[in-house]
UniProtKB/Swiss-Prot annotation:
Gene transcribed to yield this protein: rpsB
Disulfide partners: none
Record keywords: Ribonucleoprotein, Ribosomal protein
The keyword Ribonucleoprotein is assigned to this record: yes
CDD domains the record matches: RPS2
Name used for this protein in its record: Small ribosomal subunit protein uS2
Region feature (Disordered): 226-265
Lineage per the UniProt record: Bacteria, Pseudomonadati, Pseudomonadota, Gammaproteobacteria, Lysobacterales
Provenance organism: Xanthomonas axonopodis pv. citri (strain 306)
Record GO terms (molecular function): structural constituent of ribosome
InterPro entries referenced in this protein's UniProt entry, alphabetically: Ribosomal_uS2, Ribosomal_uS2_bac/mit/plastid, Ribosomal_uS2_CS, Ribosomal_uS2_flav_dom_sf
HAMAP family attached to this UniProt entry: Ribosomal_uS2_B (MF_00291_B)
Amino acid sequence: MPQVTMRQMLEAGVHFGHQTRYWNPKMAPYIFGARGKIHIINLEKTVPLFNDAMNFLSSVAQKRGTVLFLGTKRSARESIKEEAERCNMPFMTQRWLGGTLTNFRTVKQSVARLKELEAAETDGTFDKLVKHEVLGLRREREKLDASLGGIKEMNRLPDAIFVIDIGHEDIAIKEAKKLGIPVIAVVDTNYDPALVDYAIPGNDDAIRAVQLYARAAADAVLEGKAAAPNSASVREEEFSADAADEGKGRRAPAKKGDKKADAAE
């Protein structure tokens, strides 16, 4: 599991919450106090919850699951994209499209269209078209890539979602909850931590804090992948288990003179 210390969190500004007038009372257990009308988050509470969240991400990856990285606010986009690509997981950094999860079949059709346009641009198809047609198709491709490029290799619904700022991504969280997809999220002092499965009390605005969260999430995924059994060992274990079961069900041949065998005959 990626080790992030309280000092690293302090240096990244994880402990700075929102203005006190915007607080959500349900965050009270995680608030240390206030300084200059800004709530200060109790990092002694954050660290264990952070570790629980990272352990869960690692377990998902170890089971070969998919984690969708989500951060569409300006301060999160770069870090989310960079770290998701580093651990080879899907991501969304532009506006969340309603129905991305609950209407995934339609989204897959749009992704197929994106791949079709990308192929047409590289295989020479565009060269056979007139200029204004090419411009129109390129604009369509760019628009699709901006919104769906990060999930074009996500062939099924994700097994978990890692989120920065639950207020900004409220539609996505509602869709995930409806489908029973676990949500791991950074929750600032102005939101309800009960809205997600794994809440990480912390600053969801500071770029350095977001970088810390995203980097740790990617590290957790990579550690989980590294611990996952490879296909060969899985097949070997399954073969051994099948052989053992078969051996248990097979009756050993009776020896001559075996009283129990003679009685049975």
